[in-house]
């Protein structure tokens, strides 16, 4: 049948009807044909109106405007994965909520008031949960996320990574969708390692310290970065992608070892004379106690340039994890290490049991090694290595029990054989 039969006023062979509303071609202005299906112009207009209404309820970043989690919900989501650090969670939750609330209402509020961006600085010892906090926030908000290592960055023109590479990694993680990338989260780790070597500006060029801080300034504050397209050098004829970093949330984290001494020098200046208080090194404040009193001048004294500190107005401090916290980390969070290894053993058809003493011993070892929660995996991996080597070739083991001595490596884990289990239950 020719297209002529679908136009209004054509009374040739037979009368055609809209498959959706049932009106004939004489009752509408236009009838559009598909494979054995027809739709009139009125139904097309109705469909367009429905789509327009639905799109108006969707915010620019693809989420419903009422789906932005409140600070309380964000903090609760962090509780599922990160143990302790309640103050840091609260600071992060409020900062992230305000950041994305600002993005959702851009252009909708009083144009005379421009809301600034508040990037975040996380200060805490190794293994205290800095990276995990940032990762969890990105997962909860369903936004692109990338981690950059500040120690690999150098000024443009020197051997090492340029700061623009950070944005390229973010683009890669969202399939080069520029709009999505411009609302993502970037976590820059080891930010304390790019502190300048002394308080006074150096005559020689510091390309991996102060130079990197200078290069990061514009990126963090907001600039348009030129990033090679997908394929990079393979397609040099393609134009560079322009990414506006004004709405990207930057979270910088570092251990800042030695910062407690800088803070103590400021807060506990010894008096002179007979009233002077003599303190031994042992009496000095611990990192966790001192770091909560950190001020901008302490970070500048440590080696961050004032302009860089000014771009990170929100500071969240994390405490050192104690033995009880490490034990909880092993077993309580949704992705706890104990649960991960138990699932791994389940895939072999074997039950894995950890005694309370074994968890305490693993926590003690992590404290001794000063590796925090990050060191727990290597401790369990080492203790379970022989079991994971043997089990795939054995079908007589039904259960493995870990105690304190097996965690220390003094004895092998207890393997319960199938016949022993049957005899016990008989």
Swiss-Prot record:
The keyword Nucleotide-binding applies. ATP binds at residues 125-132. GO terms for biological process: cell division; proteolysis involved in protein catabolic process. Keywords: ATP-binding, Chaperone, Metal-binding, Nucleotide-binding, Zinc. Residues 5-59 form the ClpX-type ZB domain. GO terms for molecular function: ATP binding; ATP hydrolysis activity; ATP-dependent protein folding chaperone; protein dimerization activity; unfolded protein binding; zinc ion binding. Signal peptide: none annotated. NCBIfam families: clpX, PRK05342.1. Component of the ClpX-ClpP complex. Forms a hexameric ring that, in the presence of ATP, binds to fourteen ClpP subunits assembled into a disk-like structure with a central cavity, resembling the structure of eukaryotic proteasomes. HAMAP family: ClpX (MF_00175). This is ATP-dependent Clp protease ATP-binding subunit ClpX.
């Amino acid at each position: 049948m020719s297209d002529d039969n679908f136009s209004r006023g054509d009374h040739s062979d037979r009368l055609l009807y809209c498959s959706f509303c049932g009106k004939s071609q004489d009752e509408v202005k236009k009838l559009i044909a598909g494979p054995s299906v027809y739709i009139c112009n009125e139904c097309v207009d109705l469909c367009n109106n429905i789509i327009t209404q639905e799109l108006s309820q969707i915010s620019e970043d693809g989420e419903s405007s009422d789906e932005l989690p409140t600070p309380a919900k964000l903090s609760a989501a962090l509780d599922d994965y990160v143990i302790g650090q309640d103050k840091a969670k609260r600071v992060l939750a409020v900062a992230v909520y305000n950041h994305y609330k600002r993005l959702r209402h851009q252009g909708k509020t009083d144009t005379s008031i421009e809301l600034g961006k508040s990037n975040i600085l996380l200060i805490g010892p190794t293994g205290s949960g800095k990276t995990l906090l940032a990762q969890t926030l990105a997962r909860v908000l369903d936004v692109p996320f990338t981690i950059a290592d500040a120690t690999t960055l150098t000024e443009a023109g020197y051997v090492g990574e340029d700061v623009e590479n950070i944005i390229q990694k973010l683009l890669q993680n969202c399939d080069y969708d520029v709009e999505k990338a411009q609302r993502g989260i970037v976590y820059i780790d080891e930010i304390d390692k790019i502190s300048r070597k002394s308080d006074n500006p150096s005559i020689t060029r510091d390309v991996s310290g102060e130079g990197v801080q200078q290069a990061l300034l514009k990126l963090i504050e907001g600039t348009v970065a030129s990033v090679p397209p997908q394929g990079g050098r393979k397609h040099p004829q393609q134009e560079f992608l322009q990414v506006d970093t004004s709405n990207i949330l930057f979270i910088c984290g570092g251990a800042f070892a030695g910062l407690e001494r800088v803070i103590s020098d400021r807060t506990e200046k010894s008096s002179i004379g007979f009233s002077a208080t003599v303190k031994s090194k042992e009496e000095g404040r611990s990192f966790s106690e001192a770091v909560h009193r950190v001020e901008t001048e302490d970070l500048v004294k440590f080696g961050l340039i004032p302009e860089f500190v000014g771009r990170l107005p929100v500071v969240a401090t994390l405490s050192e994890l104690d033995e009880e916290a490490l034990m909880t980390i092993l077993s309580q969070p949704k992705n706890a290490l104990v649960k991960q290894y138990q699932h791994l053993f389940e895939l072999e058809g074997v039950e894995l049991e950890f005694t309370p003493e074994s968890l305490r011993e693993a926590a003690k070892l992590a404290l001794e090694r000063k590796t925090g929660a990050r060191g727990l995996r290597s401790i369990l991996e080492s203790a379970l290595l022989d079991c994971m080597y043997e089990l795939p070739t054995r079908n007589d083991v039904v259960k493995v029990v870990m105690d304190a001595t097996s965690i220390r490596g003094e004895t092998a884990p207890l393997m319960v054989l199938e016949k022993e289990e049957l005899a016990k239950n008989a």
